[in-house]
């Protein structure tokens, strides 16, 4: 077949575009969550680069907040020896379709199992589907210590945001802004 587009090629273009769109949705969710964390710890920021915040906490220790591959956002304290104390592993599931939420929670569980093995103190999952049954999600991802809805984190008056803020500040040792 001399055509530029062979039938098999056409069959793979749709899934490739969808996969690319899903990556964009996931990246957007991570960026939003990172921005919320940044807002919470802004008084402790001493340096900032793309996807990374260097903080100084109340004990005068460096704390790193980074966008990473796995977990999506990691928060670590640098000990005086230079060793990293793994504080918080955050998985962000930015997809909005309810039909796939159980798969996303399963993906978060796999990531959190790795994070637990790496010594993270807390493992959190942020979901972007408001209809998510968080009790069911806890059964599906027992390694997740806390679940948050992205919509709650965007609502600074919500109980979910206040809990997220309090825990970030307590675990990092960064004063409230």
List PLM regions with ranges:
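Interdomain/boundary linker segments immediately adjacent to catalytic/signaling cores
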Residues: 1-40
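Catalytic core segments in nucleotide and nucleic-acid processing enzymes
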Residues: 44-177
């Amino acid at each position: 077949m001399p055509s530029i587009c062979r039938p098999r090629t056409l069959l793979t273009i749709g899934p490739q575009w969808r996969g690319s769109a899903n990556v964009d949705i996931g990246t957007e969710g991570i960026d939003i969550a990172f921005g919320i964390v940044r807002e919470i710890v802004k008084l402790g920021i001493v340096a900032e680069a793309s996807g990374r915040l260097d903080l100084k906490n109340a004990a005068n220790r460096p704390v790193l907040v980074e966008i990473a591959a796995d977990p999506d956002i990691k928060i670590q304290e640098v000990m005086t020896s230079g060793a990293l104390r793994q504080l918080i592993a955050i998985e962000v599931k930015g997809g909005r379709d309810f039909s796939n939420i159980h798969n996303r929670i399963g993906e978060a569980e796999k990531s959190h199992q790795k994070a637990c093995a790496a010594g993270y103190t807390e493992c959190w999952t942020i979901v972007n589907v408001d209809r998510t049954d968080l009790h069911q999600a806890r059964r599906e991802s027992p390694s997740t210590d806390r679940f948050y809805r992205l919509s709650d984190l965007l609502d600074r008056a919500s109980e979910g945001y206040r809990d997220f803020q309090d825990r970030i500040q307590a675990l990092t040792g960064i004063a409230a802004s």
